[in-house]
């Protein structure tokens, strides 16, 4: 039986090596760049001609002055370095050179599981069942080691990966399986911890409790392993739908087809193992990843032990071909590279970061030009350390201006930095949708913001929770002028797990919007965001004329763009009522209830609710107009962070 055909051709193209010294290493080739770091194939040099292939993950220079980014980057290295297991990628060093932190990790000659599955789809066949099971068994054993890991005092660290998917399972030509990317892992040892309510990971593979922003444990990783197994067996993502809200609706309702309905030749026993791993309630899943691995191992030995299965390494070599295997496994020595590319490499060193027309994943899988599918998800992701703030588009968002120290005579209010914060939380008929985004006003510097607590709000309860709007303040005199929001959206965000979907937004005197695609597809991103990976297509931007058209399913992109249009007025609330702000930096949440006509009721949460800034935010939020939609109500909780600089 042939699976549905997928489209990710495996392409290769030569890149001129950099051959650029960096600390004790020589950077051979840039592989990818995202919102937090850039990835290089490198050589570690030693005495008497010693050299070893490694991978360098280097923090982007403009982030080195951001303590939160730096600490999370270091946290990732410290945690992953402790997890010494054959099925976990090994971290060799956390270092600092030329003003930037970097992580050195082992180089692996192989392919990620996602690319392996997609190539099988292109060839219109399934990956052999014994190979699929071996991948999931070994990955589960590596995760179990991480889940059980303790500190020096024997106290459990309660590690949860939170981002398991086929793209984070790496298969080597030597037959190893490695779990990648502990960049957003939850652990007690982390110095930068996230809160309950912060949603991290990829929607398509999340456990329901993770999607709700609830506390997660190892069973969330087991659920993600089950989803990965489902995809590997059927070439269908069980919760793939037309947009993010529909994905989360299916996930939270447990709506999926049994695997044997898609592939009848699957044994019933294997389907039972898979569905137990994907049980809706955590208590109904396997209690540990080891128990899941044991169940698969038992099935493999009882049903497939005599099938003459090809070893994993041999399968990969045949699947991708001898040329690909040779390129991955036989990287030329530095002497050979220098002799071959000496002049050209010197020219390549002058290129600006990110100027290369192609990108590769962490271990050298070359991406097609302009293809976000393969370029934007390296094996170990480059993730912003501000909780849940993705980098779905251009790679260099989120820089802040340095904050000078207060003067001795008291604080002088000169510049107010306001970040339209990182999370959107939509609830329609009790379904939580979540998209993280930022806007960068031309005259206001961005401040990394915390992410809202995710709560499902049923439509019938929304009015009661929001209540009547508070007393409105007269409109602030900062209405957007024509063309004033271009940078706000072009440099803004896209969607979580989601799409690299930026747009340039122009506003006429009446506030009617028109869009022009910004062409950011193909930029290296730290979150696997393509529609193929997440199954969520970006909703089109609609003008006010859309109110006369048919109603739509209100998507997160729609919400983001409408709020971006009112960004200037919202920012002015903080500037006008800065005396109401209790500290030099903080956050306030505003809840919007968007009725089916597109009109808004707003209410400020917390201690600023009755203040001038709170009332101003409500008034400006209620001026927003969204596309008419099919739901009775959609509730959006928007956190706004501010920072006052001298």
UniProtKB/Swiss-Prot annotation:
Enzyme Commission designation: 2.7.10.2
Cellular component, GO annotation: plasma membrane
Where does the chain cross the membrane?
A: 416-433
* Location of the protein in the cell: Cell inner membrane
Which segments show compositional bias classed as Acidic residues? 527-536
Residue ranges of region Disordered?
A: 373-410, 521-547
- In this chain, ATP is annotated as bound at 31-39, 57
Domain Protein kinase: where? 25-300
Q: Could you say which enzyme class this protein belongs to?
A: transferase
Post-translationally, this protein is described as follows, namely: Autophosphorylated.
Keywords assigned by UniProt, alphabetized: ATP-binding, Cell inner membrane, Cell membrane, Kinase, Membrane, Nucleotide-binding, Transferase, Transmembrane, Transmembrane helix, Tyrosine-protein kinase
Catalytic activity from the UniProt record: L-tyrosyl-[protein] + ATP = O-phospho-L-tyrosyl-[protein] + ADP + H(+)
Q: What GO terms are given for molecular function?
A: ATP binding; non-membrane spanning protein tyrosine kinase activity; protein serine/threonine kinase activity
Domain of life of the organism encoding this protein: Bacteria
Residues exposed to the Periplasmic side: 1-415
Q: Indicate whether Phosphoprotein appears among the record's keywords.
A: no
Query: Active site located where?
Result: 163 (proton acceptor)
What this protein is reported to do is described as:
Essential for growth. Interacts with MglA to control social gliding motility.
Query: What is the protein's name according to its record?
Result: Tyrosine-protein kinase MasK
Q: Which organism is it from?
A: Myxococcus xanthus (strain DK1622)
This chain is encoded by the gene named masK
């Amino acid at each position: 039986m042939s699976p549905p055909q997928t489209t990710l051709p495996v392409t290769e193209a030569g890149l001129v090596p950099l051959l650029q010294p960096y600390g004790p290493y020589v950077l051979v080739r840039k592989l990818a760049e995202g919102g937090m770091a850039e990835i290089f194939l490198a050589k570690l040099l030693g005495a008497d001609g010693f050299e070893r292939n490694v991978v360098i993950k280097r923090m982007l220079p403009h982030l080195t002055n951001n303590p939160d980014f730096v600490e999370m980057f270091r946290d990732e290295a410290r945690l992953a370095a402790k997890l010494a297991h054959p099925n976990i990628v090994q971290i060799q060093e956390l270092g600092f050179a030329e003003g930037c932190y970097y992580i050195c990790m082992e180089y692996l000659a192989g392919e990620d599981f996602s690319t392996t599955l997609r190539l099988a789809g292109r060839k219109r066949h399934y990956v052999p069942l014994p190979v699929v099971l071996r991948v999931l068994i070994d990955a589960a054993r590596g995760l179990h080691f991480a889940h059980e890991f303790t500190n020096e005092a024997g106290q459990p660290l309660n590690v949860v990966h939170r981002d398991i998917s086929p793209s984070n399972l790496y298969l080597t030509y030597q037959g190893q399986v490695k779990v990648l990317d502990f960049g957003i892992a939850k652990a007690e040892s982390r110095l930068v911890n996230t809160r309950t309510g912060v949603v991290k990971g990829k929607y398509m593979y999340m456990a329901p409790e993770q999607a709700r922003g609830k506390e997660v444990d190892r069973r969330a990783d087991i659920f993600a392993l089950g989803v990965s197994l489902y995809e590997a067996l059927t070439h269908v993502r069980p919760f793939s739908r037309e947009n993010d809200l529909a994905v989360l609706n299916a996930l939270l309702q447990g709506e999926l087809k049994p695997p044997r309905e898609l592939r009848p030749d699957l044994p019933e026993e294997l389907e039972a193992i898979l569905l137990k791993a994907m049980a809706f309630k955590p208590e109904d899943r396997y209690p540990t990843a080891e128990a899941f691995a044991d169940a698969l191992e038992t099935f493999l030995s009882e049903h497939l032990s005599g099938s003459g299965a090809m070893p994993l390494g041999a399968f990969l070599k045949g699947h991708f071909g001898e040329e690909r295997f040779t390129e991955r496994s036989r990287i030329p020595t530095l002497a050979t590279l220098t002799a071959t590319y000496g002049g050209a490499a010197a020219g390549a060193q002058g290129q600006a970061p990110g100027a290369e027309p192609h990108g590769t994943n962490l271990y050298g899988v070359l991406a097609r030009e302009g293809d976000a599918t393969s370029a934007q998800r390296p094996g170990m992701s480059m993730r912003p350390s501000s909780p849940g703030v993705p980098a779905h588009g251009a790679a260099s968002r989120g820089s802040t201006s340095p904050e000078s120290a207060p003067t001795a005579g008291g604080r002088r209010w000169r510049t107010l930095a306001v970040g339209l914060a990182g999370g959107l939380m939509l609830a329609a008929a009790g379904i939580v949708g979540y998209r993280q985004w930022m806007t960068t006003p031309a005259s206001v510097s961005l401040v990394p913001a915390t992410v809202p607590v995710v709560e499902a709000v049923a439509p019938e309860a929304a009015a009661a929770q929001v209540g009547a709007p508070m007393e409105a303040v007269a409109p602030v005199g900062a209405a957007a002028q024509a063309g004033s929001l271009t940078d706000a959206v072009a440099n803004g965000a896209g969607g979580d797990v989601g799409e690299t979907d930026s747009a340039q937004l122009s506003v006429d005197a009446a506030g009617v919007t028109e869009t022009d695609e910004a062409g950011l597809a193909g930029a290296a991103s730290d979150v696997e965001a393509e529609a193929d990976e997440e199954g969520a297509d970006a909703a089109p931007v609609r003008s006010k004329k859309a109110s006369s058209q048919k109603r739509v399913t209100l998507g997160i992109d729609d919400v983001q763009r409408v709020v971006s249009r009112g960004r200037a007025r919202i920012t002015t609330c903080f500037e006008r009522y800065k005396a109401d702000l209790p500290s030099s930096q903080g956050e306030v949440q505003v809840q919007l209830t968007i009725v089916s006509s597109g009109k808004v009721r707003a209410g400020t949460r917390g201690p600023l609710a009755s203040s001038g800034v709170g009332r101003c935010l409500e008034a400006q939020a209620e001026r927003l107009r969204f596309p008419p939609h099919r739901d009775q109500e959609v509730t959006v909780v928007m956190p706004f962070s501010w920072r006052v600089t001298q």
